[in-house]
Amino acid sequence: MSFLVAIVGRANVGKSTLFNVLTNSHDALVFDFEGVTRDRQYGQAKYDDLDYLVVDTGGISDKDVGFDEFMAKQSQIAIDEANLVFFVVDGRSGLTTGDEYVASLLRQKDKKVVVVVNKVDGTDEEAAMAEFYSFGFDKVFAISAAHRRNTQKLVDKFLKKPLNEYYQDYTQTQEHKEQQRHGIHFSLIGRPNVGKSTLTNRMLGEDRVVVFDMPGTTIDSVSIPFERHGQKYTIVDTAGVRKRGKVKQTLEKFSVIKTLQAIQDSNVVVAVVDARQGISDQDLSLIHFAIKNGRALVLAVNKWDGMTEEDRIQVKQDLKRKLFFLQDYVDIHFISALYGTNVGHVFESIDTAYACANKKITTADATRLMQLAVEAHSPPMVGKFRIKLKYAHVGGHNPPVIVIHGNQVSRLPNSYKRYLENFFREALDFRGTPIVFEFKQSENPFADRKNKRSKDEGSKSKKVK
């Protein structure tokens, strides 16, 4: 589970600009389905090789007309779940009643808060910050997000220490969790009302009743261990598990943050799509996030029952067009969670994806496959020289990481990298899991000796003169 930074504040103070600086913007996940604000953004960021999540909560106000209940709930969740809060204010406008309202909400929380005074370019920083100390938060810092002024200092000063402390504790906790982990850890992800709760109950068994709502918690993800045909599993539920008869046709409780964290904590992710609504940009955002995090993936297209043959053909065509990037390596199952149709096949794909993601490959096998790939299709020329791949080894599992050493590997085109991925995938029969390739420049073990010899020869020539 990643460290979470929440960016909060009233509208138009520069929250999105700061979000873009922290996440490099292209990593943003924007969700606009019902129950989640259209401008809500979630992104991944990195500091010294440590990953963390960033959420831009959108403008918070007590006066917005039609301020949606779910919009407020998502902002509340973001603040409640955050390890660190960046409370952004406008240094040019000065302190406003809107800022006071946000500050009053944050004072009710036991959170680490940094008041980030934005838009201070062309102004006296100390003067701009002065009035914001009245909020009662002891950490106040001035930046210009648009010009990236002091943004790195902001991260160095306020994020570095808590982030490192979090991952020290998290690593120890995670090691304990791994020891206690019950079989294959998988999660069901998807938009609200696609049938995640119905599918969860179907997987757990008809008479299984799980209490979801925990005292004092807005939305909790619950890990539920169970066993099927001798195989142990743990399902991570983020929507709430209810007895079948008590599932109402209302909008599910939904937390994007919980969903992203569930993806990171899973071995396998089952993306649930509503066949009657089709696959949306939000579905694609969640799938891309899962792949980027190296999770094994299975796709379950729910509510397949009762559809006409014509509609089914249309759905399959849309899936093929929108999921082209999965390169046919992810199993797609057309199911009815309500009636249990094909749910057993989903379990089979979970087992297969998990096995492939954790498959043991020796250095000899990895190198042999690399050599076969090169023999079938050599790397391209770089100037007068051909890129040379020397040997390969496994660098990790879940996802499988193949490390290839060679010369000029930094110039290897993406097309050849895709070729290698497809070659390895076919040769190893990898289903359901992404494969990560890392390319490392081989070091010349005689380089230092050669340089030393050159220096010695140079000094000798000077003496001769």
UniProtKB/Swiss-Prot annotation:
GO biological process: one example: ribosome biogenesis
Residues the record lists as binding GTP 2: 190-197, 237-241, 302-305
Q: Where is the KH-like domain?
A: 359-443
Question: According to the UniProt entry, where is the signal peptide?
Answer: none
Q: Which residues are noted in the entry as GTP 1-binding?
A: 9-16, 56-60, 118-121
**According to the UniProt record, where is the region Disordered?**
446-465
Taxonomically, the superkingdom here is Bacteria
Q: Supply the alphabetized keyword list.
A: GTP-binding, Nucleotide-binding, Repeat, Ribosome biogenesis
Give the family from UniProt: Belongs to the TRAFAC class TrmE-Era-EngA-EngB-Septin-like GTPase superfamily. EngA (Der) GTPase family.
Role noted for this protein: GTPase that plays an essential role in the late steps of ribosome biogenesis.
Its subunit composition reads: Associates with the 50S ribosomal subunit.
Q: What is this protein called?
A: GTPase Der
